[in-house]
């Protein structure tokens, strides 16, 4: 019987070897991709539970299948915890991803072809904020706003003038590569001025918002979307919040039956665990440590004139660095750092001159190393290791030194092998 084959290692060695290799990679690499984090064993246990067997189209108390009384409890727990965590009146926890959450929000707020003002991808926005290769750019008429050419920060007066000119039905705030705090109150004032809805995609900063170390968009936005991983440290999935009952009904209809069929109740259970973890007072200390670590790491680059720190600093979990004075492009920097077991990604910088497949910059985030227990001292050490590798990118002996120093650091802060 299939139920006898419960051990992946014995039943499917080829797959197990790949999983084990990834476990080893995570243990012995320094993870600096800003959209990644390390979940607790409790989150993984919930996601690997028998809930994966259950179909539950619909919502708690109103399902299309029988036998849903247990998953109703699970989903209700997730909903109520999300509402409490973010101070929202309504929450939808069924969206499979942040992109699905954004798609549902658009469906709830606007019609195909409507004009939307969103952050340009090159300035730090996300694909779902209007990229022409994404469903958002294909379905709606997106106009991109950028950052100030001198400060590389959002210029709210300029965004207001742009909004007056294009008269959008919706304004999208939020980013995937913007290192500064966003003033959601100003964005709402801009939206009100032109009669537009305001949607905030807080996927990257959700954990910081939950902990109260970053301003919350919930009091200002008509709809807030998020992922549940990244700084929130939960499973990969989406979340939608609102304080408007009428919009909540539209959101629910947009998610199901508009975009999805059966929800992933095992993932929703893992979301519920993550929300409970984030409600613990210790999570605020964790979120503050992310900000402290990121600031400390960024400061090392700011003090080295061979690198340029975009916008001059960071207020959150992420920052961008122009590396073109020491290496040809961000892609080569990413590849080189992978070789010394430091994982990050190439990233376009504002007013980018290189191809998006090469880029002038790299993006660095500190959520994952903070989850391992690393602090300011380790963050500074990692910055120096990155600089050492990039500056000496043709020196095999020095690169091996960096690799060994990375191993010493990861051994000192084990992930799951404690």
From Swiss-Prot:
Which proteins does it associate with, and in what oligomeric form? Homodimer.
What does the similarity note say?
Belongs to the SHMT family.
Matching InterPro entries: PyrdxlP-dep_Trfase (IPR015424), PyrdxlP-dep_Trfase_major (IPR015421), PyrdxlP-dep_Trfase_small (IPR015422), Ser_HO-MeTrfase (IPR001085), Ser_HO-MeTrfase-like (IPR049943), Ser_HO-MeTrfase_PLP_BS (IPR019798), SHMT-like_dom (IPR039429)
Q: What reaction does this catalyse?
A: (6R)-5,10-methylene-5,6,7,8-tetrahydrofolate + glycine + H2O = (6S)-5,6,7,8-tetrahydrofolate + L-serine
Q: Name one GO molecular function term.
A: glycine hydroxymethyltransferase activity
Q: Required co-factor?
A: pyridoxal 5'-phosphate
- Location in the cell: Cytoplasm
Which keywords describe this protein according to UniProt? Amino-acid biosynthesis, Cytoplasm, One-carbon metabolism, Pyridoxal phosphate, Transferase
Query: Which residues are recorded as modified (N6-(pyridoxal phosphate)lysine)?
Result: 230
Superkingdom classification of source: Bacteria
- Briefly state the protein's biological role: Catalyzes the reversible interconversion of serine and glycine with tetrahydrofolate (THF) serving as the one-carbon carrier. This reaction serves as the major source of one-carbon groups required for the biosynthesis of purines, thymidylate, methionine, and other important biomolecules. Also exhibits THF-independent aldolase activity toward beta-hydroxyamino acids, producing glycine and aldehydes, via a retro-aldol mechanism.
Residue numbers marked as site, Plays an important role in substrate specificity:
229
Q: Name the species this protein comes from.
A: Streptococcus pyogenes serotype M6 (strain ATCC BAA-946 / MGAS10394)
HAMAP family associated with the record = SHMT
Annotated (6S)-5,6,7,8-tetrahydrofolate binding sites: 121, 125-127, 355-357
- Spell out the protein name for this chain: Serine hydroxymethyltransferase
Q: What top-level class of enzyme does the UniProt entry assign?
A: transferase
Which GO biological process entries does UniProt record here?
glycine biosynthetic process from serine; tetrahydrofolate interconversion
Pfam families in the cross-refs: SHMT
EC annotation from Swiss-Prot or TrEMBL: 2.1.2.1
Query: Which CDD domains does the UniProt record give?
Result: SHMT
Query: What are the GO cellular component annotations?
Result: cytosol
Pathway in which the depicted protein is active: One-carbon metabolism; tetrahydrofolate interconversion; Amino-acid biosynthesis; glycine biosynthesis; glycine from L-serine: step 1/1
């Amino acid at each position: 019987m299939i139920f006898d084959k419960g051990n992946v290692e014995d039943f499917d060695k080829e797959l197990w070897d790949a999983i084990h290799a990834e476990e080893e990679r995570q243990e012995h690499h320094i993870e600096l991709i800003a959209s990644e984090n390390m979940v607790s064993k409790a989150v993984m246990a919930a996601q690997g539970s028998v809930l994966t067997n259950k179909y539950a189209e619909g919502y708690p108390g109103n399902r299309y299948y029988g036998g849903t009384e247990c998953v109703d409890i699970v989903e209700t727990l997730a909903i109520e915890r999300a509402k409490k965590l973010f101070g929202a009146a309504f929450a939808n926890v069924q969206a499979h991803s942040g992109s699905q959450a954004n798609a549902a929000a658009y469906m709830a707020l606007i019609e195909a072809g409507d004009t939307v003002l969103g952050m340009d991808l090159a300035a730090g926005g996300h694909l779902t904020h209007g990229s022409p290769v994404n469903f958002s750019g294909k379905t709606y008429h997106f106009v991109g706003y950028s950052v100030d050419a001198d400060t590389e920060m959002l210029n709210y007066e300029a965004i207001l003038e742009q909004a007056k000119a294009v008269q959008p039905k919706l304004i999208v705030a939020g980013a995937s590569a913007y290192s500064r705090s966003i003033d959601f109150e100003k964005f709402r004032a801009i939206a009100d001025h032109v009669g537009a809805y305001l949607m905030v995609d807080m996927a990257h900063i959700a954990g910081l918002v939950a902990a109260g170390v970053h301003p919350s968009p919930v009091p200002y936005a008509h709809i807030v979307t998020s992922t549940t991983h990244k700084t929130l440290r939960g499973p990969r999935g989406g979340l939608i919040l609102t304080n408007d009952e009428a919009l909540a009904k539209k959101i629910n209809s947009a998610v199901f039956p508009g975009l999805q069929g059966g929800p992933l109740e095992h993932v929703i259970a893992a979301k519920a665990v993550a929300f409970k973890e984030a409600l613990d007072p210790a999570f605020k200390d964790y979120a503050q440590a992310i900000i402290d670590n990121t600031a400390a790491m960024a400061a090392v680059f700011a003090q080295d004139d061979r690198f340029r720190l975009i916008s001059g600093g960071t207020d959150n979990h992420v920052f961008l660095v122009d590396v073109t004075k020491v290496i040809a492009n961000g892609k080569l920097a990413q590849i080189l750092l992978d070789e010394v077991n430091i994982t990050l990604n190439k990233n376009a910088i504002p007013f980018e001159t290189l191809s998006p497949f090469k880029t002038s910059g790299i993006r660095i985030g500190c959520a994952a190393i903070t989850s391992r227990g690393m602090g300011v001292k380790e963050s500074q050490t990692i910055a120096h290791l990155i600089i050492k590798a990039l500056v000496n990118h043709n020196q095999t002996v020095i690169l091996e030194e960096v690799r060994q120093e990375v191993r010493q650091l990861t051994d000192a802060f084990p992930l799951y092998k404690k």
